[in-house]
């Protein structure tokens, strides 16, 4: 099996190294094309207004000045002599749950693979803070990842469906199991912070916040909150099918 890896945290991210070790439990034919710098929050964006520059680290590892979507396209269309059988994106430092999947470069890497007709899976891992220091239990993904990946690769999926996997922020021993979930709903508390540069001109930072919201049973949020690994099948068809007939009647 030939596997292509990417992420949005960048070529030097610990999560990418973890994912490569997990992938190598399945195959030795593993390739990596990942962003040169952190591309978190770039979602499914393409670099169309400037050229892509790629740095070859070795025969199987490449760093690209581009987005995760760019990386998948370059890997499949340029770097590899034949397409991969599987695309894995991650392991992201921080979960990608509910509405956050629309912002996630990690999820977008798997989305692009699916658009190219290749089975794709996104992996993310929760973190906690200890005295304002981010603590990521990477061993949770590394210990549980191989067996889970083998099962997911063996599962039958329809065309246009990819998987979004999230590990909880606990040790491997504390994980209660794996649940197949639906996408939850977040209430964002986005805000804009204005600052001034040395010449007095304003510049701005977008700040993510979270407002209290009800977590529905069976969702990715509920699984992570309760200490389970969440596996959410997502698809590319964004049509609101339940509304079509009603809308057609309104327009008749």
UniProtKB/Swiss-Prot annotation:
One of its GO terms (molecular function) is exopolyphosphatase activity. Pfam families: SurE. This is 5'-nucleotidase SurE. Belongs to the SurE nucleotidase family. A divalent metal cation binds at residues 8-9, 40, 92. Its cofactor is a divalent metal cation. Keywords: Cytoplasm, Hydrolase, Metal-binding, Nucleotide-binding. It is an enzyme of class 3 (hydrolase).
């Amino acid at each position: 099996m030939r596997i292509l890896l990417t992420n949005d945290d960048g070529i030097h991210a610990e999560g990418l190294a973890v994912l490569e070790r997990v992938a190598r439990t399945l195959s030795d034919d593993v390739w990596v094309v990942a962003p040169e710098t952190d591309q978190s929050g770039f979602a499914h964006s393409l670099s169309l207004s400037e050229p892509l520059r790629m740095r070859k680290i070795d025969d199987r590892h490449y760093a690209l000045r581009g987005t995760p979507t760019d990386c998948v396209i370059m890997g499949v269309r340029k770097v590899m002599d034949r397409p991969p059988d599987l695309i894995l994106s991650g392991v992201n430092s921080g979960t990608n749950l509910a509405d956050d999947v629309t912002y996630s470069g990690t999820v977008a890497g798997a989305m692009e693979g699916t658009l190219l007709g290749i089975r794709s899976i996104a992996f993310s891992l929760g973190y906690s803070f200890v005295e304002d220091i981010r603590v990521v239990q990477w061993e949770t993904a590394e210990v549980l990842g191989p067996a889970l990946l083998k099962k997911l690769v063996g599962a039958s999926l329809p065309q246009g469906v990819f998987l979004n996997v999230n590990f909880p922020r606990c040790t491997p021993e504390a994980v209660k199991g794996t649940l197949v979930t639906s996408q939850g709903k977040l209430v964002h508390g986005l805000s804009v912070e204005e600052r001034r540069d040395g010449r007095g001109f304003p510049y701005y930072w977008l700040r993510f916040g979270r407002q209290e919201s009800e977590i529905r049973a069976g969702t990715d949020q509920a699984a992570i909150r309760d200490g389970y690994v969440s596996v959410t099948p997502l698809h590319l068809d964004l049509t609101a099918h339940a509304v079509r007939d009603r809308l057609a009647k309104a327009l008749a």
